[in-house]
From Swiss-Prot:
Broad EC category: transferase
Swiss-Prot/TrEMBL keywords: Menaquinone biosynthesis, Methyltransferase, S-adenosyl-L-methionine, Transferase, Ubiquinone biosynthesis
Pathway: Quinol/quinone metabolism; menaquinone biosynthesis; menaquinol from 1,4-dihydroxy-2-naphthoate: step 2/2; Cofactor biosynthesis; ubiquinone biosynthesis
Function as written in the Swiss-Prot or TrEMBL entry: Methyltransferase required for the conversion of demethylmenaquinol (DMKH2) to menaquinol (MKH2) and the conversion of 2-polyprenyl-6-methoxy-1,4-benzoquinol (DDMQH2) to 2-polyprenyl-3-methyl-6-methoxy-1,4-benzoquinol (DMQH2).
Name recorded for this polypeptide: Ubiquinone/menaquinone biosynthesis C-methyltransferase UbiE
Residues engaged in binding S-adenosyl-L-methionine: 69, 90, 116-117
Residue pairs linked by disulfide bridges in the UniProt entry: none
GO terms, biological process: aerobic respiration; menaquinone biosynthetic process; methylation
Protein family per UniProt: Belongs to the class I-like SAM-binding methyltransferase superfamily. MenG/UbiE family.
EC number per UniProt: 2.1.1.163, 2.1.1.201
Chemical reaction(s) catalysed: a 2-demethylmenaquinol + S-adenosyl-L-methionine = a menaquinol + S-adenosyl-L-homocysteine + H(+); a 2-methoxy-6-(all-trans-polyprenyl)benzene-1,4-diol + S-adenosyl-L-methionine = a 5-methoxy-2-methyl-3-(all-trans-polyprenyl)benzene-1,4-diol + S-adenosyl-L-homocysteine + H(+)
Xref: Gene3D superfamilies: Vaccinia Virus protein VP39 (3.40.50.150)
GO MF annotation list: 2-methoxy-6-polyprenyl-1,4-benzoquinol methyltransferase activity; demethylmenaquinone methyltransferase activity
Length: 243
């Protein structure tokens, strides 16, 4: 059986899926609060930039993968309007449930679906925009997931990946201190769960850097791939087109 990584730990591929599921079952109820605390609210700016770059218009079909608590889904549903079609999807039932409930609380009625990004249950050439925010690094077969995202995008459509990335070198020492000391402390203090936030820090370090992910998207068949560094490379938004 093939090995992969869960944070810094080497595990069987099937074990990683179970461990990642356990992390997100654990953090689901505190997810938005912890995002605000960990990023000092910056995650809202990163998502706002992604929403602006997506440029969703009335009538668009949009797939939001690893959509979690539904921040992007809600914005896309508003932009696509009643003639559009926006799917809120996640592989984790706890995250999907929290997101679905919050969307309904905001008056957003849109389909929520439990699904695996590596085996998307959608037809070829269907979506104008496909997005995944802070989800790709948790996927076991990132290449398969990227290929699936391209498959379901329409010709002329775009695939967008918002993810933690490699910080600029002058920031690295302070960022490492924050990641491996402060994040687990915040997790323990506010969510009673240091281990899940230790995994977060480790998973970020194991994720491909900006240029490597760009190459992976090109190898998945996407064209004109580019990326935007945000907050000194703490996060990067990659955008690829399907021609």
């Amino acid at each position: 059986m093939s090995k992969t990584h869960f944070g810094f730990e080497s595990v069987e591929e099937t074990e990683k899926a179970k461990k990642v599921a356990g992390v997100f079952h654990s953090v689901a109820s505190n997810y938005d609060l912890m995002n605000d605390l960990m990023s000092a609210g910056m995650h809202r700016a990163w998502k706002a930039f992604t929403i602006a770059q997506a440029n969703v218009r009335p009538g668009f079909k949009v797939l939001d993968i690893a959509a979690g608590t539904g921040d992007l889904t809600r914005a896309f549903a508003k932009a696509a309007g009643p003639t559009g079609e926006v799917w809120h999807t996640d592989i984790n039932e706890s995250m999907l449930r929290v997101g679905r409930d919050r969307l309904l609380d905001k008056g957003v009625v849109t389909p929520s679906l439990l699904c695996d990004a590596e085996k998307l249950p959608f037809p070829n050439n269907y979506f104008d925009v496909v997005t995944v925010a802070f989800g790709l690094r948790n996927m076991t077969h990132k290449d398969a997931a990227l290929a699936e995202m391209r498959r379901v995008a329409k010709p002329g459509g775009r695939v967008m990946v918002l993810e933690f990335s490699k910080v600029w070198e002058p920031l690295k020492k302070a960022y490492d201190l924050y990641s491996f000391k402060v994040l687990p402390w915040l997790g323990d203090r506010f969510a009673k769960d240091a281990d899940s936030y230790r995994y977060l820090a480790e998973s970020i370090r194991m994720h491909p850097d900006q240029d490597t992910l760009k190459t992976m998207m090109e190898q998945a068949g996407l064209d004109a791939v580019k990326y935007y560094n945000l907050s000194g490379g703490v996060v990067a938004l990659h955008v690829g087109s399907k021609y």
